[in-house]
Amino acid sequence: MDTQAFKRSLHHSERYNRRGFGRANEVASNLEKAYQSSLIGSIRDNGYVLQHGRLQVKLAEAFGFCWGVERAVAMAYETRRHYPSERIWITNEIIHNPSVNEHLREMDVLFIHAEGGVKDFSCVNDGDVVILPAFGATVQEMELLHERGCHIIDTTCPWVSKVWHTVEKHKKQEFTSIIHGKVKHEETLATSSFAGTYLVVLDLDEAQLVADYILGQGDRAAFMKRFAKACSANFDPDQDLQRLGVANQTTMLKSETEEIGRLFERTMLRKYGPIELNKHFLSFNTICDATEERQQAMFSLVDEPLDLLVVIGGFNSSNTTHLQEIAISRGIRSFHIDTPERIGDNNSIQHKPLGEDLFIESNFLPAGSVSVGITSGASTPDRVVEHVIQKLIDLTSG
């Protein structure tokens, strides 16, 4: 499929909108009430530090809603204002935050049902309004909705669209796209749908397996078994790993994406030599600025003297998970929660350790003076962070 031609056609349709409806002022008060926080503003103005009795809170200097998320949420609110009585669907969570998605449900925005990773679009009719979330939708979903006569409201983050352009360049030049991402993540599913030949690698370890195979170290059957669900149809590692371009899911850990890019550059240099390198390797910077800022702020925060750290964001949020990884790498007691309600009045916290199930820890706040670092993922509103801080204040004020 010529995805570039399809996008051009879609973008010229009267039933497609990616710029909003000019109703920002009409929804501003709703957004402020639901998501903003005067307390967080005050803490920012005070050098990102709050002292309350024995509790000291240190905020990361970049956290919470990024501009892509703000744009997507605002467009969703504008859509309901513009279509007050029409049926409005969304193909997935608008962002990975439970409170934001619940607000949309309260506005009678309907979520496409999915079972086993397969979405059921049979309920979507001609004339319905369909919102594409911040991390995008597959080109096949867009095509289906367009052919069905839906009004498509595209809130895809421009940084995600940039990655789509990158893999389309790979496809046009007959390069295989190596996508650093999570195979089942909505953004990676969308990105791979715009690619030609592709292979998804989760981390540096998987990238090393690919690099080893390129250099003749590895078994074909074992390779295909490992990556069977992470590659394009009819993928042939002996043919399709000769010309590579690197792209990434925008919320992955920046340092790892960069290292993966360097690994494949070294690998292709070793195999083909410096004169032929550009014929076999392409590299584009598709790391999101907001993701990078939050990760750098987290690295600065974990250098502070902290007793523990609370990371706030959806449990299915990739960028939040990577913030948690940074805390773990420094050996800091850290707790990933998705809502303030995870903190109990009895000084317990229900949190999700990395790669594990939910766990309840008792007496998580120590006695005496305590310094708590706080950060949040790009899909977490300031209002949620405020409520977490208020919970901590209540627990340390008794």
Curated annotation (Swiss-Prot):
Cofactor binding mode and count: Binds 1 [4Fe-4S] cluster per subunit.
What residues sit in the active site? E187
- Binding of dimethylallyl diphosphate occurs at H96, H185, S317, S318, N319, S379
Enzyme Commission number(s): 1.17.7.4
User: Can you name this protein?
Assistant: 4-hydroxy-3-methylbut-2-enyl diphosphate reductase
Q: Does the keyword Ribonucleoprotein apply?
A: no
What positions does the entry give for [4Fe-4S] cluster binding?
A: C66, C157, C288
> Which residues bind isopentenyl diphosphate per the record?
H96, H185, S317, S318, N319, S379
Q: Which UniProt keywords apply?
A: 4Fe-4S, Iron, Iron-sulfur, Isoprene biosynthesis, Metal-binding, Oxidoreductase
Pathway involvement of the protein, from the record: Isoprenoid biosynthesis; dimethylallyl diphosphate biosynthesis; dimethylallyl diphosphate from (2E)-4-hydroxy-3-methylbutenyl diphosphate: step 1/1; Isoprenoid biosynthesis; isopentenyl diphosphate biosynthesis via DXP pathway; isopentenyl diphosphate from 1-deoxy-D-xylulose 5-phosphate: step 6/6
Matching HAMAP family: IspH
User: NCBIfam families, from UniProt?
Assistant: ispH_lytB, PRK13371.1
UniProt-annotated binding residues for (2E)-4-hydroxy-3-methylbut-2-enyl diphosphate: H96, H185, T250, S317, S318, N319, S379
Taxonomy-wise, where does this protein's organism fall, top ranks first? Bacteria, Bacillati, Cyanobacteriota, Cyanophyceae, Synechococcales
Question: What would be one Pfam family of this protein?
Answer: LYTB
